[in-house]
Amino acid sequence: MPKHLLIVESPAKAKTINKYLGKDFTVLASYGHVRDLVPKEGAVDPENGFAMRYDLIDKNEKHVEAITKAAKTADSIYLATDPDREGEAISWHISEILKERGLLKDKPMQRIVFTEITPRAIKEAIQKPRMIASDLVDAQQARRALDYLVGFNLSPVLWRKVQRGLSAGRVQSPALRMIVEREEEIEAFITREYWSIHAECTHPAQHFSAKLIKLDGKKFEQFTITDSDTAAAAQRRIQQAAQGRLHITDVTNKERKRRPAPPFITSTLQQEASRKLGFTTRKTMQIAQKLYEGIALGEEGSVGLITYMRTDSVNLSLDALSEIRDIIARDYGTNALPDKPNVYTTKSKNAQEAHEAVRPTSALRTPTQVAPYLSNEEHRLYELVWKRTVASQMIPAILNTTSVDLAAGNEHVFRATGTTVVVQGFLAVYEEGKDNKNAEDDDEGRKLPVMKTGENVPLERILTEQHFTQPPPRYTEAALVKALEEYGIGRPSTYASIIQTLLFRKYVDMEGRSFRPTDIGRAVSKFLSSHFTQYVDYDFTAHLEDELDAISRGEEEWIPLMKKFWVPFKELVEDKKDSLDKTDAGSVRLLGIDPTSGKEVSARIGRFGPMVQIGTVDDEEKPRFASLRPNQSIYSISLEEAIELFKMPRVLGEDQSQQVSVGIGRFGPFAKRGSTYVSLKSEDDPYTIDLARATLLINEKEEIARNRIIKDFENSQIQVLNGRFGPYISDGKLNGKIPKDREPASLTLEEAQQLLINTGKPARKNFSTKKTATKNETRKQTTKKRTTDAKATKKVSDKPVKKQIKKRIAPNITQ
């Protein structure tokens, strides 16, 4: 019988570690967090020292029971959850549960940590156990309590002032503010025209181009030329001065070193995976988790391929450095090795607990060697980690930049530049990605012919090119993570969840690979920025993260921090609940006056989303409403565009003596004839669709409905229907199966009733077009069903039944 119980978070991790430890250990998984705050008011009690009420997470109850059962017979217990605050908190919760159940009175329980899942790392960790770090647990609990108090108190204000179902998060809200402010910058941006001038030269060795840097004896700036006439005039002056050639006045060569990037931390891994692989932050972390926990490598079994992926550290262990340097010497030559290992310092504003960087557990496992055992995505991410790690310990690349100045007469000067790689160094393995390219990137790899001062170069032609300034780009995932990190907002474990929450809440949409705020997102951000300014302030949020870090280091206590935050926050929430209306909330924009009715026209966030409105609730007549079209926004729609929306519904004409119209409802555009409604296809525009197309869509729907009914039974709600997966029986409440050897159309009512009793399952939706059954028929069918249910209940009554507790729906509480 195993003597020791070791508890980790995931079953994959448990499987890998179990292979290393042998029969003396039982390795079980908690499957993540085992307890969470109860989802109702009072889970955090500020009046009682911020006491926190926890409950077991339903889906993990069985795993807690398995851990409890194993703990009863184990001689000792090791808590081996992840080496960060969340992992420390999970270990603490497990220890509290076992303590409450009286299982720790006569046996030791210790905490062990490791940042890679290898036999050496696991065995070393077991040899160096420690107690649970209360400082890390306090920091995690303070973060959880803050998130709860913000979400539970601020979200209901949004429900009342903006729209029901919204949520506000302590870290999510500043991230949303970043995206919204960037969108406002883009909208406010005024495009400016400017022109550049280039010279195309025909040197005997090769053609090359040079850009104008001096015009009429003055420095050529971006906005020196802003129209085509001025550009054409400058072109003529230069051509006349050049007389078919340019004179070389200066040649300079500069050598510079480009150093390799440090090995990955969480944020840089997410950024590079986004730039180079097109992965979302969520996908990156999911794949990295698999690589960390273990991949089956043939006869070698399950092996952890990378170190822990939630880290702020750029350090590499001495063993890892030695192995990496051996690989470099073997595959790239000793000339690619620096005299001593490269050492990096973190740029992160608040580095957490000391871990290693994200690296391969063994550099000897090259991407090519492990490729047969990995999926395509796993292989691409592993290759990224492997190359970045190896490159970080190689010599710098040496680049040579040549700059040549060429004169056209005495007043005009062009400059040609080119950069070539003299020594590849780390570039032989890896080159860091960029969000935006600059002029230096364009010059890189461009070679120039050998030229000397005093020579003349034949001029082929002078080119002018029109440009327009561009607004700042929207945030990509990589750029947003970088910005969050630079501001000190969030931590390695939260970047992916912040982004996921914004998308899930529909506060932002993805447009290509960039974030675009939705109208709901903008309304929420505007409301919070106007009325809860401090709590979406970047510096305030970053300072709060600093204080949480200080708690994790034992430098501050968590309860004083909670008091300092809670008292003014609660006062502000109570004040705003009573003092604001929806106009103050920033979700209403006045557009002007409707010329027909003379009433006020506004754009606003309504119950079902963005809309426009003619009139107000104070008018005698009820206001009229219209939904916005796709790609329209309440923040940019004009009065004319808004009035156009009220042309819905459009009457297209008549068909089968019934009016046919199109409109836009809660669920999108639709066509209607009589009592038949049909959603328009994505390619159909409700403002341009004609009668023929609308009639076709309606007829198609009615045809499907007609063909759906195989058989009706007189005086019965039961029907034999055609479904997506074949014929079936339904009474509108239950759906039953038809045996494959039975012809559906030949079923009798009694047979159909019996099939419903034997195979019936609750129907998702009642599509029946039949009238409601009479009271007698309903009573008759119900009696039969109840009899069957009673038998079934009696049969299983001796088995334990889990008590179901109905819980009040609580506001969403997010980061």
UniProtKB/Swiss-Prot annotation:
Pfam families: Topoisom_bac (PF01131), Toprim (PF01751), Toprim_C_rpt (PF13368). Residues 167-172 are annotated as: Interaction with DNA. Mg(2+) binds at residues 9, 82. Its cofactor is Mg(2+). Gene3D superfamilies: 3.40.50.140, Topoisomerase I, domain 2, Topoisomerase I, domain 3, Topoisomerase I, domain 4. Its EC number is 5.6.2.1. The active site is at residue 308. InterPro entries: Topo_IA, Topo_IA_2, Topo_IA_AS, Topo_IA_cen, Topo_IA_cen_sub1, Topo_IA_cen_sub2, Topo_IA_cen_sub3, Topo_IA_core_domain. Residues 133-573 form the Topo IA-type catalytic domain. One of its GO terms (biological process) is DNA topological change. Residues 3-119 form the Toprim domain. Residues 759-815 are annotated as: Disordered. GO terms for molecular function: DNA binding; DNA topoisomerase type I (single strand cut, ATP-independent) activity; metal ion binding. The record marks 33, 143-144, 147, 159, 310, 505 as: Interaction with DNA. Monomer. Releases the supercoiling and torsional tension of DNA, which is introduced during the DNA replication and transcription, by transiently cleaving and rejoining one strand of the DNA duplex. Introduces a single-strand break via transesterification at a target site in duplex DNA. The scissile phosphodiester is attacked by the catalytic tyrosine of the enzyme, resulting in the formation of a DNA-(5'-phosphotyrosyl)-enzyme intermediate and the expulsion of a 3'-OH DNA strand. The free DNA strand then undergoes passage around the unbroken strand, thus removing DNA supercoils. This is DNA topoisomerase 1. It comes from Xylella fastidiosa (strain Temecula1 / ATCC 700964). The lineage of its organism: Bacteria, Pseudomonadati, Pseudomonadota, Gammaproteobacteria, Lysobacterales.
